[in-house]
Amino acid sequence: MVDISTSLLCVKKEKILDTVYKLEDAKTDYFHIDVMDGEFVKNDTHDLMLEYCEYLDNITKIPLDIHLMVKDVKNYVDSYLIFNPNIITFHYEACKKEEIMDMIKYIKEKGRRVGISIKPETDVKEILEFLPYVHVVLVMTVEPGKGGQELIPSTISKIEELNKYREEHNLDYEIEADGGIKVENSEQIIDAGADILVAGTAIIGSKDYADTIRKLR
């Protein structure tokens, strides 16, 4: 069964604790932490996400899924390692190609699962050489930087391509889809080969978190 990683990006600070408890009861698999630096993308969420991680570190055992939408990847990786995340994902587009393997090795050496992410316009072929070494490939199904966007239909073919490549080369990375995911389109994304669905607005904006998570799966 597909895993659900609930994004906390759209949760207001004064509601974070109550929301976390409700999401625990609703059986979310991960808390998805969208870290933005104001450079790689326009929004800057770093301070708020650090604060959320501190809350989560004290009150929940649900694993953290850290998604770094930042230019200075190494610096931000170090900031979030203290929270013992399950997954740390960085963007292919944020690094020079010769730096990517070093970053993959660094995150692995810290005992974390490592993910590489691509924007909607990035060709899957750009990251093929790194796929044997990562645990997760995150496909942005919207433009990174803000929640509540509509899924870009053409990104589903990237999930299909990654799934086919995984099967043909006997690899075991998980495919994570992030952006514009809701009950109405989740089946199509799962059928394309996704293993983890990131959803924020679809869950947080619903009346019944557990029912929405169940329907997304």
Where are these regions (language model features)?
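Hydrophobic faces of well-ordered beta-strands that scaffold small-molecule active sites
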Residues: 2-7, 31-33, 64-68, 86-90, ...
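Conserved, mostly hydrophobic/aromatic
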Residues: 16, 23, 34, 80, ...
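Structural motif
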Residues: 26, 59, 83, 110, ...
